[in-house]
Amino acid sequence: MMKITKFGGSSVANAQQFRKVKHIIDPARRFVVVSASGREHKKDNKVTDLLYLIEAHLKYSVDHLSLFHLIEERFISIKNDLGLSYPIEEDLAKLKGQLNKTMSTDYLVSRGEYLTAKLIAEYLGFPFVDAKD
């Protein structure tokens, strides 16, 4: 029987939460699925919400870079706090360069899960499998 574990956004909100995930994963689980990083505290923003805001800012030609910077800070902080080698800065720079009015909302918002999954895969020592595959 195939065993899959799913962790929501608050379970992967920061490096401390990643450590908890690693500690509780049953070795019999073959697949781990994660949401985008969630809130670290009540007044914090979910990465998914920030991505939706970026999409709205792009649609109405409003500056979105400060929102994107919050996402960059979150992911780079997790990477650095866990001592990971995944060059997330490259994927973030690529995404930043792709941002435009014609970008699919689904694609943009899915980047939160994608980047979180890349980080957790390295941290757990699991192979990364892109959901699109």
Explain the meaning of each model-derived region:
Residues 1-133:
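Nucleotide/pyrophosphate-binding catalytic subdomain
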